Amino acid sequence: MRVAQNEQMTIGEVDISKIRFDPKSRDDIPKVLRGLQFVYTNLPLRTSIFELLDAKISPKVSKTNGRPGMTLWNILVCGVIRLDLNCDYDRLHELVNHHNTLREMLGHGAFDEVTYHFQTLKDNVSLLTPELLDDINILVVNAGHVLVKKSPDEALRGRCDSFVVETHVHFPTDINLLFDAMRKSITLTAQWCEELRMSDWRQWAYNVRQVKRTMRTAQNKKRSKAKDEKQVAKNQSLLIEAHQTYLNVAQSYLDKVGQTLTTITEQGLSDAIDLVRKIEIEGFMAHAVRQIDQIKRRVIQGEDIPHAEKVFSIFQPHTEWISKGKAGVPVELGLKVCILEDQHQFILHHMVMQQQTDDQVTQEMVIEAKKRFPKLNVCSFDKGFHSKDNQVALKEQLELVVLPRKGKLSKQAQEEEQAQAFVKARRAHSSVESAINGLEVHGLDVCRDHGIEGFKRYVALAVLTRNIHRIGAILWQQDIEREHRKKNHADPDIRRRLAA
């Protein structure tokens, strides 16, 4: 049984519209909760969001029968809080069980002893999909535009840029990736054998240490700084020998894992869980086979491995090696994300870029943003988004395209880029860096979720969270100004000075 929100209040429960926040607080939690309060108290917005959540998360779940699950509202609140605070599920678990104001937002009163389990939070927040979050984001941005008193006829002026969201991986080398693959292959196989009462892998911990020992030996052979030709040649032969030993040990255990899987398969897989286990182990074995081949080609045969063949994490295979040329940041491991922000500091659209460059997503970003917000007619970019096709295509979509060209400019291009409207929009473009910094502070520095689907969900939730936080910040400032006016109006001395 899952409902959008419990209609019957309990003793001690505070209505969400009546929740009060400390105006002196400078923490992030009150502002994002103020934004969530706005979402809940705006009846048309709340109804539309609940309809989306109900249709995507629990379309066939009974609302009257069965064990109660987390409400749709609580799922959304927990997801937003996790991203806004850039925290893991352990901290979220602590907050939802012991933070009084947050529990009021979740619908729990002072006498309500309901608590949430760690796995409950993890399973339910993961039900949010990127497509669902994108639909909710459109509703939130439209409500935000009403809040800032945007005229229905007012045009939207966008600014577009990309940045890297890192995946949670260690720095990759071919030999440590091979160790990762061997460690998981041996460990998972040993656990399975232990459950089946098979003694093939009684010494699995020693086996893993042996693989690691040979890997460390191969790593240490790289550290020689000898300059004598004979010593260099000798060190090179020792390096090759150490790597060959490492490969031989890895291959021997890889063969043993394969034999064990064959034995278990011949005995018969009992259920679907066993099939999933077998597929998982075979996946790590495939990673190990690839790394053995690449190490052999690079170290022993002296071949340069093409970049397209390299994998930078066996746990997050979608990870890319990105070098944007930033000072002090030679390389970033993750995926690029492109965002488009309007003049009111709301993020209209975003895109996760897989094996794509800025100029390849320029047109799609504008087209998709205009589908969601037809009033968008101006957009600025940096030079990385430039191409001849983009210059032509964007002029069909927008009234003003602020896309600086690369290289020497023609006379016509110079006139375009020196126009007053172009210069004004280009100067305002740097404000998008503030949005990027806000996203990185509130979750998008490193993705904590697993897999490409988890990555997309994490980014979409961060964008929605940022827009809700923006609404909360606007309301927070309005509340402060309102209280300041009340205070001035109530003070007779101030009134007399103003009258004078």
Q: Which residues make up each language-model segment?
A:
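Short, conserved catalytic/metal-binding motifs centered on acidic residues
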Residues: C78, L92-H93, H117-V125, E154-E166, ...
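Charged, often Cys/His-bearing segments associated with DNA-binding zinc-finger transcription factors
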Residues: M1-E51, A55, Q477-A500
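Alpha-helical support elements that line or immediately flank enzyme active sites
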Residues: L76-N86
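Trp/Phe/Arg-rich N-terminal binding region typifying the photolyase-homology
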Residues: K60-L72, L85-L133, H145
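Active-site- or DNA-interface-adjacent structural scaffold in DNA-acting proteins
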Residues: H108, D112-Q316
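Acidic, metal-coordinating catalytic cores used for nucleic-acid/nucleotide bond scission
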Residues: G66-M70, S380-D389, G407-K408
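Electropositive, glycine- and tryptophan-enriched low-complexity nucleic-acid-binding patches
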Residues: H318, K326-R372
